[in-house]
Regions:
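Bacterial Sec-dependent N-terminal signal peptides
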Residues: 1-21
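Extended carbohydrate-recognition surfaces in non-catalytic/accessory domains of CAZymes
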Residues: 20-133, 155, 215-238, 246-248, ...
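Carbohydrate-binding surfaces of carbohydrate-active enzymes
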Residues: 22, 273-280, 367, 620-887, ...
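Accessory beta-strand-rich segments of carbohydrate-active enzymes
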Residues: 28-34, 64, 104-251, 278-279, ...
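Extended acidic/polar, glycine-enriched regions
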Residues: 169-176, 272-389
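Low-complexity, Pro/Ser/Thr- and charge-rich linker/hinge segments at domain boundaries
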Residues: 200-220, 247-253, 381-399, 821-840, ...
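N-terminal carbohydrate-binding accessory modules
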Residues: 363-432
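Substrate-binding/catalytic cleft of secreted carbohydrate-active enzymes
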Residues: 439-637, 670, 674, 681, ...
Length: 919
């Protein structure tokens, strides 16, 4: 009976601690210009704020005003030019003053904004320590609680930090409390220069250069792939919480894992945390830890069950703290042998194994009560890295649990107004994982919301975390000492690491992308990283393209980095064989961390953000349908850097489009072949030259026509599905440079007795050449099989169809390529009749998702080429996102195929979706 009572007591204590955290979501917002009362009055619970704007936090100021109908959504059309900027100079230049919503004419973004909310604190908070945490603000803040100033803008500064404030003396448990936060603009909002991108193939919009001085998001001032955000994203952009503890608190827990045996049969787990006495008297207590295996992994729309059993690991340690003392407490296998876990369930990257997670709960006990508690998931895994050398070039190689990982993925951006939901975050991570990506980076997300890293953990997406973004500081220029406040920068790095370091998905800490900080910041950052985490490599920069001896000799101790985006390929269209030739050159290609090309969305997306898309008024223009709106949304170019070559290829290969839909459809052919080639070029020399490849970019921060494989609406375009095919662990491909059929096995299991079939099919459907052979392919390698002859006897357009099957005849991989035998001519694709496929489908509701099974058959005597499949809702509108096993299906006469799709019940409006072939 005593044991049962103890268990019940611990359960009650656990629930009490968890129940003490409150998220404050519903707020009121008002410009300080319109608030004449004092701060103490505004933050009093009795204050009347009914006339203020109702907002849901997290939100920036501008996004709140868009939601409330004060300004149009800047992400669509040219709406951004109907919103005044924080820069008066820019407003005058672009005549934006007339759009100011303020009747007094004052700039709406230069002064502070109040965010105010009221919350009834539980009575159980009485006698406890009460903490208010701001998880992300931009840029400075004063915080008031119940008429009292808790902290001011001199200490609450920086976008990439959390702020935990002790509000015990001002909180009123059992009563209504007011929290009021005054948010201030960034210190250096800058002037957008030029800030516009309205000419097709014209100059890029540039930046707001002064913004680089602050610890804030640089793309808020404009970028080649991002519009100028008029308020520079000032606001409370991450959640605000209140929690209660007793006098002994836990902070900065850190779980590290190593695999001391090469066969990974044993894991050594180490747990550490800081324990702090917040009182003015000595405290004696205990620290407890409980580690369990996570068998049911939760996602927003489904739950994934993971097999396995681990007996819960329970650890206890006595701790004694003097008044105000802070102490490091550790649990190690030397003292607690159960932390040596036999036959551990390991976390692997996507495509290399399961993503097993473990859960740890840490508690501080004082007397019979829980003083503080923290819990989170972690993964048992070990990341190591080394360099592969060819001549003077180096490629970085990552190993997870002793197995080398061929890195395939790309870069992402946040929504330009920082608007996100947990579901959208997980949807994006799922799109990446289902595309067979395993590595993701961002130069624009130094402090992502926790859900991003949690989703990467669950989907097996390795993440290298970039501290200082991109091109904020460039050696040898006037920006080299940015950011202005180095102490703030390093403090921000410290909080990033403390916040994220328990995530198994993080494989490297990266100083910045493409550039490098000055020596003082470089050394301070490196020292901070080494003091907080030695389990991961620190890479000071992803790339460098300057005279190191002259400008950054201090960098030499961290060279070579083994990754780069210097030189070509860059970010424009090129023929597929170009990427293969570049890889064969070796130089700057061994771990290519950025390359890309434009990738126009499907027409159904384009028409949503380009209002002129449905017009044919300018059909005779040589650049139809492109106009200033297309330019603003990505159709720019300088020195053939971006969009011009892509557009030229569309018109040269497929003819002049008669509608915007024609243009988007032609673009799908081009993007599919180009993005596939970027990944297959890396595949064709896997490990003997290449160890990784990352595209710029995976997603878009706003509706855009340039670099992406799925668009802002979460609609994948053709480049997504052809990249997905190229990144599959077991893959068959045709090398674009020498027409060799190659089997790529990036898995760690050998392929035994597989069958390769290759055919050349003319456009009249006759088979001009074919080959079949059986072979075995070792683990983690590639094998050339046969060369497709190029003898000039094929029709003007022809196809190469590849299949790889296992011993039982099951399809492992397939691929389809289209070629011209003369000139760059695919006009046939734009004029040929597409036979309708015979289709059937079944829909099954599975918890919170629908699974749709589609069967397709081509009963005609002609090719049915590039069929884009979609699901529609009750109104006939296309549903997104939908997670297709394959898409853009081509079937030759007599062929059939089964494809599966999954979609959230909520995204379908709760109504059974319908299958369509989109036209």
């Amino acid at each position: 009976m005593k044991n049962i009572s103890l268990i019940l007591l611990l359960c009650v204590q656990s629930l009490w601690v968890q129940a003490q955290t409150l998220e404050l979501k519903q707020w009121r917002m008002m410009s300080s210009l319109d608030v004449k009362d004092t701060e103490a009055q505004v933050s009093a619970p009795s204050y009347e704020a009914g006339q203020w704007q109702a907002v849901t936090v997290p939100t920036t100021v501008l996004n709140a005003m868009v939601k409330n109908g004060i300004y149009p959504d800047p992400r669509f059309g040219l709406n951004n030019y109907q919103i005044p900027d924080v820069s008066d100079e820019f407003n005058k230049r672009m005549d934006l003053v007339k759009y100011n919503h303020r009747k007094d004419g004052r700039n709406p973004w230069q002064d502070s904004y109040w965010y105010r909310t009221e919350v009834k604190l539980p009575k159980t908070y009485k006698g406890k320590k009460v903490w208010l945490t701001l998880h992300g603000i931009n840029y400075r803040a004063d915080v008031w609680v119940n008429g009292h100033l808790v902290a001011n803008k001199d200490t609450l500064v920086g976008m990439f930090r959390r702020f935990k404030l002790d509000i015990t003396n001002y909180a009123k448990p059992g009563a209504t409390n007011c929290v009021a936060v005054k948010i201030y603009q960034v210190d250096h909002p800058g002037v957008p220069t030029p800030g516009t991108q309205l000419k097709v193939f014209g100059p890029v919009r540039g930046h707001s250069y002064d913004l680089f001085k602050d610890e804030t998001l640089k793309i808020s001032g404009g970028w080649d792939c991002a519009p100028v955000v008029r308020d520079r994203n000032m606001g409370i952009y991450q959640k605000v919480t209140i929690e209660a503890t007793d006098k002994m608190i836990l902070e900065h827990p850190f779980v590290t894992t190593t695999l001391p045996k090469k066969d990974t049969s044993v894991a050594d787990v180490k747990v550490q945390m800081e324990v702090c006495n917040t009182s003015n008297q000595k405290l004696n207590g205990k620290v407890q830890a409980m580690i369990t295996l996570v068998n049911d992994v939760k996602f927003p729309t489904y739950t994934k069950h993971m097999d396995g059993f681990l007996k819960p690991i329970k650890l206890t340690k006595q701790v004694s703290l003097e008044a105000g003392e802070r102490k490091m407490v550790e649990f190690t296998s030397a003292d607690f042998p159960t932390l040596l876990i036999k036959k551990p369930y390991l976390w692997y990257p996507n495509g290399y194994g399961e993503q097993y997670l473990h859960h740890i709960k840490l508690s501080c006990l004082l007397g019979n009560g829980v003083s503080d508690s923290k819990e989170f998931d972690f993964g048992i895994r070990e990341v190591t890295t080394d360099l592969h050398q060819i001549g003077d070039d180096y490629g970085r190689v990552f190993y997870v649990n002793g197995k080398r990982v061929f890195c395939k993925g790309g870069w992402i951006q946040p929504d330009i107004l920082l608007e996100e939901t947990e579901k959208r975050i997980y949807d994006e991570a799922r799109l990446m994982a289902e595309a067979n990506m395993n590595i993701i980076g961002s130069e624009d997300m130094p402090s992502p919301s926790d859900e991003w890293l949690e989703s990467f953990d669950k989907y097996g997406l390795m993440w290298w975390h970039v501290f200082y973004q991109c091109f904020r500081m460039t050696p040898g220029t006037e920006t080299e000492h940015n950011p202005a406040n180095h102490d703030l920068a390093v403090t921000s790095v410290e909080d990033m690491m403390l916040r994220y370091r328990n995530h198994p998905s993080i494989i490297a800490w990266v100083g910045c992308n493409e550039v490098l900080m000055d020596e003082s910041l470089y050394r301070a950052t490196k020292a901070k990283v080494k003091s907080l985490d030695t389990s991961r490599i620190y890479i000071p920069t992803t790339s460098y393209n300057w005279d190191v001896d002259e400008l950054t000799p201090y960098l030499k101790e961290d060279l070579p980095t083994g990754t780069t985006d210097d030189g070509a390929p860059d970010y424009n269209w090129a023929p597929s064989d170009y990427f293969f030739h570049k890889v064969d050159e070796v130089h700057l290609q061994m771990f290519r961390n950025e390359l890309g090309m434009p990738s126009v969305p499907v027409y159904n997306s384009v028409r949503k953000f380009i209002p002129t898309a449905e017009s044919t008024a300018n059909v005779n223009s040589p650049i139809f349908p492109l106009d200033s709106i297309w330019a603003e949304h990505g159709a720019w170019d300088v020195s053939n850097y971006c969009y011009r070559s892509y557009d030229n290829a569309i018109r040269t290969m497929f003819g002049d489009p008669k509608t915007a839909k024609d243009y988007c459809d032609f673009g799908q052919f081009l993007s599919a072949d180009g993005y596939r080639a970027m990944f297959e070029a890396a595949n064709h020399r896997m490990w003997d030259i290449t160890s990784g490849v990352m595209i710029w970019k995976v997603n878009s921060c706003w509706p855009d026509v340039c670099w992406q494989v799925y668009d802002w609406f979460l609609t994948p375009n053709a480049s997504y599905y052809f990249s997905k095919k190229a990144m599959e662990p077991v893959h068959i491909q045709l090398n674009a440079d020498d027409f060799k059929v190659t089997v790529v096995n990036a898995s760690h299991q050998a392929l035994e007795g597989v069958t390769v079939t290759a055919k050349v099919i003319n456009n009249d459907m006759s088979v001009a050449w074919e080959h079949t052979s059986q072979l075995s392919v070792g683990a983690d390698c590639y094998k050339p099989v046969v060369t497709v002859p190029q003898n000039g006897t094929y029709t003007y357009n022809y196809f190469v169809k590849l299949e790889l099957r296992d011993k039982s005849g099951n399809l492992l991989s397939d691929n389809l390529y289209w070629y011209y035998s003369q000139h760059m001519d695919f006009f046939w694709f734009s004029t040929m009749e597409k036979p309708a496929l015979t289709t059937s489908y079944e829909v099954v509701k599975d918890d919170r998702e629908y699974e749709v099974t589609v069967r397709l058959k081509n009963e005609s005597k002609r090719l049915s080429f590039f069929n884009r499949m979609a699901l529609t809702d009750a109104q006939g509108e296309e549903i997104n996102p939908v997670f297709w096993s394959d898409n853009y299906i081509s079937l030759f006469p007599g062929e059939e195929k089964e494809v599966k799709a999954r979609v959230a019940v909520s995204d379908a409006g709760g109504v059974t979706p319908k299958f369509v072939i989109a036209h």
